[in-house]
Amino acid sequence: MSAQPVDIQIFGRSLRVNCPPDQRDALNQAADDLNQRLQDLKERTRVTNTEQLVFIAALNISYELAQEKAKTRDYAASMEQRIRMLQQTIEQALLEQGRITEKTNQNFE
């Protein structure tokens, strides 16, 4: 699908961006989220300069993204460790099962 121009409003300013039709809702949601963040930031910080607010919001979003990436890395490492432990447990159980089967076969001979 080719991108099509979409008009969005960010903090009172019109912005035209190209967006694939199937991502239009996500773009509008992102714009709404950014508008809310900017409004909240303006109220909390009393900063009135829009450019400063945008930079502060961008830094906050970048920080949040870095935190989420770190969480994802930690989770992936934890899952890899659990998978290795499960593999070892399964391998050990299979070895034990093989020994039991071997002993049972020897007893019947």
Swiss-Prot record:
The protein's name in its UniProt record: Cell division protein ZapA
PANTHER family: CELL DIVISION PROTEIN ZAPA
Chief localization: cytoplasm
Taxonomy of the source species: Bacteria, Pseudomonadati, Pseudomonadota, Gammaproteobacteria, Enterobacterales
SUPFAM superfamilies registered for this protein in UniProt: Cell division protein ZapA-like
Top-level lineage group: Bacteria
Subcellular location(s) of the protein: Cytoplasm
GO BP annotation list: cell division; division septum assembly; FtsZ-dependent cytokinesis; septin ring assembly
Subunit structure: Homodimer. Interacts with FtsZ.
Keywords on record: Cell cycle, Cell division, Coiled coil, Cytoplasm, Septation
Sequence similarity: Belongs to the ZapA family. Type 1 subfamily.
Function: Activator of cell division through the inhibition of FtsZ GTPase activity, therefore promoting FtsZ assembly into bundles of protofilaments necessary for the formation of the division Z ring. It is recruited early at mid-cell but it is not essential for cell division.
Coiled coil: 21-99
Pfam families linked to this entry: ZapA
Molecular function per GO: identical protein binding
One GO CC term on file: cytosol
InterPro entries membership: Cell_div_ZapA-like, Cell_div_ZapA-like_sf, Cell_div_ZapA_eubact, Cell_div_ZapA_N
